[in-house]
Design a protein with these regions (language model features):
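Acidic, Ala/Val/Gly-enriched low-complexity intrinsically disordered segments
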Residues: 5, 13-16, 26-29
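Short hydrophobic targeting helices and cationic amphipathic motifs
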Residues: 8-11, 22
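Alpha-helical scaffold domains
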Residues: 24, 28-252
Length: 252
């Protein structure tokens, strides 16, 4: 049994104490990125549920394979690992790249959770790496998560604004969706000029994923500034898709 296998064996013990988890993660921290990838992969696979996996794959139109872990259970598998990574203060991009290429969707969810947990260590120069995840193995689930990470970077570096304007005109509709949604949750920190420009760039689209996103972005901001959203709808109502208007006005 290798050292890595030994620690994985310990991880399988259901009543392992938090102290032991910390010791295990400290040891895993010393492994190579590839070994860490295999460790995380095995840890998630050990909690697989075939029935739920089939249901999840069907819900996602069989685009991806699943182990069948719900979000809460999946996150419990590696919460201590992410806590240790935050202490380290360094993002393991080779690990994330391996996870993103994995055939099981939970591994892409791990990447999103990892980046959200370590978002304070991200800079504008990391966005090309995140963009590779936005464009690869893409679907609504990962797009709607990764856009929040990009939005956080944008709060600290205004260069992100121009990039999001470029994304809002991209030929890939899911890249455009990420641009539309990247300010979700910003509340009073929302850049309204940027929000308006990105939305206007997507007027005339018949894509459900785009029009829903426009409505959600406006609806989210209406919680903070309903007057701004009402005014926007009044000005642009004739140019907006009915779906966008309906979603945007739900809280008004």
């Amino acid at each position: 049994m290798t050292l890595r296998d030994y620690y994985l064996h310990i991880l399988k013990v259901s009543k392992v104490t938090r102290c032991k988890y910390h010791k295990i993660n400290a040891k895993l921290d010393k492994l190579s990125s590839m070994d860490r990838y295999h460790s995380i992969r095995k840890l998630i696979a050990e909690h697989a549920d075939e029935n739920k996996a089939r249901q999840m794959a069907q819900y996602m139109r069989h685009r991806f394979r699943f182990h069948g872990l719900p979000a809460a259970g999946r996150k419990r598998c590696y919460q201590d690992f992410l806590r240790q990574e935050r202490r380290n203060g360094c993002i393991d991009w080779p690990l994330l790249d391996e996870c993103w290429q994995d055939e099981y969707r939970e591994m892409q969810y791990f990447v999103s959770d990892y980046l959200l947990a370590l978002k304070s260590f991200l800079t504008f120069t990391d966005i090309p790496k995140i963009e590779a995840y936005v464009r690869g193995k893409q679907w609504l689930d990962t797009i709607d998560s990764l856009c929040k990470i990009i939005g956080y970077v944008g709060l600290n570096d205004s260069r992100t604004n121009l990039l999001m304007l470029q994304w809002s005109l991209d030929s890939d509709i899911l890249v455009r969706r990420a641009a539309i949604e990247h300010q979700l949750g910003r509340k009073g920190q929302t850049n309204t000029e940027l929000l308006a420009s990105i939305i206007v760039n997507n007027f005339g689209s018949n894509e459900c994923f785009i029009n829903k996103a426009i409505g959600w972005a406006l609806r989210d901001f209406s919680r903070t500034n309903p007057a701004w959203v009402r005014n926007f709808l009044q000005i642009h109502q004739t140019s907006m898709h009915k779906m966008s208007c309906r979603e945007a006005g739900k809280y008004l």
